[in-house]
């Protein structure tokens, strides 16, 4: 059965949440751009932590060209389950296309942060934004008391990039330098973890007439 395009479009996840949770365990599993993309993806999760998006939907939210995301689906599988499914389309030459259902991992209490959707409005390159999320994940009381060399080694990044990104964050008012390191100043961007809601678990329900079907008298 072919489905009109307008119905297919309505199947994508279009409702944005006010926040996204990010587990600290993924800090070294994604590079900065992909970590920010993961944040954007998570903002559009449903109650079961599922997101039905195409690459073009993600590119639209991150402000990138689709070509920049050519390896995203492969890379993101380091932190979540991506299920592929066939979708019929109303096209004269093509009967179906393949879609992705991203399954956001559940909250790993207490080792996670809660980041406001307002972060998407911060005017910084996505590499810098992803780097900032990494800092939030490893900071203690919003402070990082490491030298540039040690921080670069910890994050698996180059020292020059760390230095450059820190300066960008300082100019954006998201970081201030202190003796022996720096302090993050996310203000309203970093939310209290108490507001975070764990994902719901989907439990298949038998049809209403299941009992009648099972115990139908002979």
Q: Model-found features: residue ranges?
A:
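Electropositive, intrinsically flexible nucleic-acid-contacting patches
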Residues: 1-218
